Amino acid sequence: MVQEIGKGENGFTNSLYSDDFYLFQEKLLRNYEMSEGINLKPQFVPQTIYWLYVGGKPVGYGKLRHYLNQHLLQHGGHIGYAIRPMDRGKGYAKILLNKLIQESINKQIKQILLTCYESNEASRKVIESNGGELRDKKEGVCFYWINNI
């Protein structure tokens, strides 16, 4: 699934992408460390990866950043997600984002920022269907906020 998503698109960086299985394992360990705030590079914040399984197979994954720094306020926000190409258009992104929002509530994140390209109509619909309120547009990027209060 991670291979099918590719290196990234529409602003989502597939940090797990690799042709090398051992490198993939290392990336999984690195993502665990990131979720715990261990060995973070200065520009990074803790983030947790969540997987969406349907019928016993992974169809997508999302990243929940535990808080924002100045960079993430302009690029990326709290949440990023991707669905494998063959499973797009089936409502899985809406389900995954809803689950990520629930996890953000568990982490006591009161307001969630999501960004997507203005041209990414599918992602805009997913965000809006999960309560995203468009508050700004800058250089072709939409800034949505969701209140968890």
Protein language model annotation of sequence segments:
Residues 115, 128-146:
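Conserved catalytic-core motifs of GNAT/GCN5-like acyltransferases
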Residues 101, 119, 134:
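Ligand-binding pocket scaffold of soluble enzyme catalytic domains
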Residues 1-78, 139-149:
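GNAT-family acyltransferases
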Residues 67-69, 86, 119:
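Short coil/turn motifs at secondary-structure junctions
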Residues 114-122:
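Conserved beta-strand-loop-alpha-helix junction that forms the acyl-donor binding cleft
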Residues 91, 108, 120:
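Conserved G/P- and acidic residue-centered "switch" motifs that form tight phosphate/ATP-binding loops
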